[in-house]
Amino acid sequence: KKYDLSLSPDLPLVIMSARIAFEKGFNLVLEILEHLVRYNIQMIIMGDGDKNYISQIVKISKKYPGKLVWVPFSQKDETSLYAGGDLLVLPSNTEPCGLNQLKAMRYGCIPIAHSIGGLKDTITNFDFNNREGNGFVFTNYSALSFYGAIMRAREYYKNKTLWNKLVSQAMRLSYSWDLPATRYVRLFKTAIKLRQEAASENGQK
């Protein structure tokens, strides 16, 4: 309601919160955006940056009122978007780390991402057969591959039982340092023990 979207329960609400720039994949977004909002999704794009990209987004949003909205970046509102959104798109062509996908998954907003950098490390394709994975990825950096990943997510979204399973898995994932730190401590203790045993066998202290 805040963004004047005519929300439909049959269509996923797609979020994109990023600096509006080529590096974040907005060239791909604009290739498919009009087709997406005409037929398949509702979308909120949040961010500041390239005025040419923003102008094109706003132009499309005026053709499809209630389906597409652009808003400037707001840290406070970004969290509410993740909480209310179904999908987060991250079609970056470079991404050293990336935190948006981690924040979004915490709120049950499923990522669709180009498999690169930190996105590749934290997002895996959801597998229908074994029910593993936490999102949808595409490996070829092209509008067609990006569109295909969105359509895969769109099909899974129709199956509410399956979708709820995916959301539940994503929300349970932990990317804190607690687990890796525990493993490193265990590894160091094992290494120290082995060194002490080797020194003892050699008669060294």
Name what the model sees in each region:
Residues 83-167, 171-172:
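Catalytic binding pocket for nucleotide-activated donors in carbohydrate/polymer assembly enzymes
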Residues 1-4:
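A short helix/loop element that forms part of the nucleotide-sugar donor recognition site in Leloir-type
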